[in-house]
Design a protein with these regions (language model features):
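Short helix-loop boundary/capping segments
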Residues: 2-82, 86
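Generic serine detector
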Residues: 2, 15, 67-70, 100-104, ...
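Internal, hydrophobic beta-strand segments that form the core of beta-sheet-rich folds
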Residues: 9-11, 77-121, 126
Length: 138
């Protein structure tokens, strides 16, 4: 079971504009291996096309108390992700994977969302009302 999976994570690149660097911030959407996805932190390693950059995927419980395996049910995520990104910045700095721990040095620059399927799975998912809103606080 651990060799093959069907998973979907919404990833943002968190770019350190002051040091021309980046890391990955993930929002867990689905994973057939786990009913509830735990927090994950590691370097992107192990395959030819890896980035070698830090990955921080927040725990599923940061977004919902429902299981990924609630098939047929809508699962709503409505969460301020800035505190989670700040946690990722602190952890990346602590582990020596980034130079800056100043939130003002970082920007969300790209995102990707899609299936990562390493086995012979048949999978489909419907996503509705996907949005990201920035709120400037003085």
């Amino acid at each position: 079971p651990s060799l093959h999976c069907a998973q979907t994570t919404l990833f943002f690149t968190v770019s350190d504009t002051a040091h021309d660097d980046m890391w990955w911030f993930g929002v867990p959407i689905f994973d057939n291996r786990e009913y509830v996805r735990a927090e994950y932190m590691a370097l992107d390693l192990g395959k030819d096309d890896c980035t070698g950059k830090f990955i921080y995927t927040a725990a599923q419980t940061e977004f919902t108390d429902k299981s990924f395996h609630s098939f047929g049910d809508w699962i709503d995520y409505d969460r301020d992700i800035l505190p989670l990104i700040a946690r990722g910045i602190c952890e990346a700095k602590r582990r020596g994977y980034t130079k800056s721990d100043s939130l003002s040095d970082y920007r969300l620059t790209t995102m990707n969302l899609g299936w990562e399927i390493t086995g012979t799975y048949s999978a489909a998912m419907e996503i509705s009302r996907l949005s990201l809103e920035a709120v400037i606080v003085d």
